Amino acid sequence: MRQMIEATELTKNYGNVTAVNGISFSVMEGELFGLLGPNGSGKTTMIRMLTGQVRPTAGSARVMGLDPAEDPIGVRQLIGIVPEQETPPSFLTAEEYLHFVARIRNLDRIDERCDRWFDLLGFQEKRDALCKDLSRGTRQKLMVAQAFLHEPRLVLIDEPLINLDPIVQRTVKDFLQEYVRDGGTVLISTHILEIAEEICDRVGVLHDGKLLYCGQTEGLAGPGRSLERSFLDLVRGDAGA
């Protein structure tokens, strides 16, 4: 299997604060990998380094063979990105926004691509609504659609299900799992243990900028112990170290 993401001793300091501290991990093709940790653990900073939005203080990364610190535009042309709680332009309709993204990426068959995603994510009836009038869940569907519009092989999603109702959560989770089954690769960040347990093949547990565990999701739980108990023990043990 091809290595889609490789992080090597990635570190990011903001003044005297270390947001990410020497983290190394890899994500393989056809994998749904989760960065799992509480708020403030370094998940978003890690994604921003991998997508070239933030330069690391130390260490390096390769994303689909490119260095995001040296070629951020090249990386972002290849991958899909769903930032946390990103809001599309309020003055555009949902359809206009997808057309705008498609034109920026010089895509063909724009109408066909947009129709597919409105149907696939189940918000065809909202295509003519202004983005400012969309519910939070529909806006999230729209941001997922724009990330997949150019049919990328790798997508990075920061907190994909935050503040979404259960029906929208189910739609997004089902779609991500189907995308991976079809050969795509996804890296998500989440602070919700149940999401990682349900849909992720492997997880990296982050706390205070450090990687405490990286491996199979079921391997996080010890014999006779729940995943939640093991996760909390990891985080509390690190906090007390």
Task: Give names to the regions the model predicted.
Residues L130-G137:
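Conserved ABC ATPase signature
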Residues H99, R103-K126:
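Conserved ABC ATPase "signature" region
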Residues C214-G215:
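ABC ATPase "signature
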Residues V155-E159:
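Catalytic Walker B motif of ABC-type/P-loop ATPase nucleotide-binding domains
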Residues E151:
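Conserved catalytic motifs of ABC-family nucleotide-binding domains
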Residues T51:
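Helix-to-loop junction immediately C-terminal to a conserved catalytic motif
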